[in-house]
């Protein structure tokens, strides 16, 4: 982290006001840093399993009452995966900087500190029970949870994220000022009482900020460590969805990949794209009960499908036709991964309803041109014209118009493209040899 004293920090602010701002977003340093973070995380978790016991099985197991009880694993002391260095050179369990399953001092404290933050936020759910009575668009107690989370977040970050570089001490307050926006916006909207792919994107950005400034080192953390962080995040957000009946944010309904998530499928598909000698389930068997039961605790993709089974009933091909199509027409996990990445570019990073709530600071995710490093134009609209956060009767955080396959723009199934049209698995997350300008340079 050289020249940290020259970094300018600022509270992130809105820059995407309507769909016409999307082209500028795709020219921004922020956009390339998001893609870079996604790319390096994918490479890290390829071929890796989650250690058993990290994911809370009750959250994806159907019961008469879909709300997980408050005495499940989320409220126990941290249950970190034990060292598992089975084979020398195993990137899932052994760090690059050592031939032992150990983390550097900074990574050990910050890895555990990050899990402690998620554990505290889980306890806040226990302390904030849902209000009694029917609620059509989410339970208002969720706003109390958000208020508590926002009030405590600054202290949570400072208490659990440790600096091991003295030159960065003077910059830490500014760093936290930018960073905390992204974690605070990772758990849904307190106003709209919804959760969706934009909030999932915000958590990726939060992790990217820690990686960027070496507060999490991918050279020392293992693939299983990274998966554990995301697994704990996903368990927390699914508890929020279940306990507070959160609406899907900007969902395409049955014509979308999933009501709430996209990245979880990318990471899970990457887990099935690693060591060629490792036994993995065939793509077209992934929806079968034996495969779901076997892999739902160790693979994020399968775990996400298990969650769908918990919250939805009826024929799978009717309520989740996109996922059903993947497992009816694709035979290779490499094609599943590349297709999901292309879909992410279009349906998440390319959609205004999703990225309008992604804000930009001065250093972590700047609104500056990737090629020239100059500020991108800002076309700010009047507040009374673009106030998307007003608490009206919106359907799924959008306009209230019923979504059908005829009135939304859809991404063609990328896994069904001709071979000549396909790119390599990570083409959508590489920069043709360029690296994003990081805020500390």
From Swiss-Prot:
Region (Disordered): 66-100, 421-441
Keyword rRNA-binding: no
The entry's keywords: Cytoplasm, Isomerase, Nucleus, Rotamase
Chief subcellular location: cytoplasm
Reaction(s) the record says it catalyses: [protein]-peptidylproline (omega=180) = [protein]-peptidylproline (omega=0)
MF annotations from Gene Ontology: peptidyl-prolyl cis-trans isomerase activity; protein tyrosine phosphatase activator activity
EC number(s) per entry: 5.2.1.8
Taxonomy, superkingdom: Eukaryota
Keyword Ribonucleoprotein among UniProt keywords: no
Compartment annotation: Cytoplasm; Nucleus
CDD domains xref list: PTPA (cd04087)
Principal EC category: isomerase
Pfam family, one: PTPA
Stretches that traverse the bilayer: none
GO CC term, one of those recorded: cytoplasm
GO biological process: autophagy; DNA repair; G1/S transition of mitotic cell cycle; mitotic spindle organization; regulation of transcription by RNA polymerase II
Biased composition (Polar residues): 66-75, 421-432
Entry function: PPIases accelerate the folding of proteins. It catalyzes the cis-trans isomerization of proline imidic peptide bonds in oligopeptides. Acts as a regulatory subunit for PP2A-like phosphatases modulating their activity or substrate specificity, probably by inducing a conformational change in the catalytic subunit, a direct target of the PPIase. Can reactivate inactive phosphatase PP2A-phosphatase methylesterase complexes (PP2Ai) in presence of ATP and Mg(2+) by dissociating the inactive form from the complex.
Protein family (similarity comment): Belongs to the PTPA-type PPIase family.
Protein name (record): Serine/threonine-protein phosphatase 2A activator 1
Biological source species: Debaryomyces hansenii (strain ATCC 36239 / CBS 767 / BCRC 21394 / JCM 1990 / NBRC 0083 / IGC 2968)
Gene: RRD1
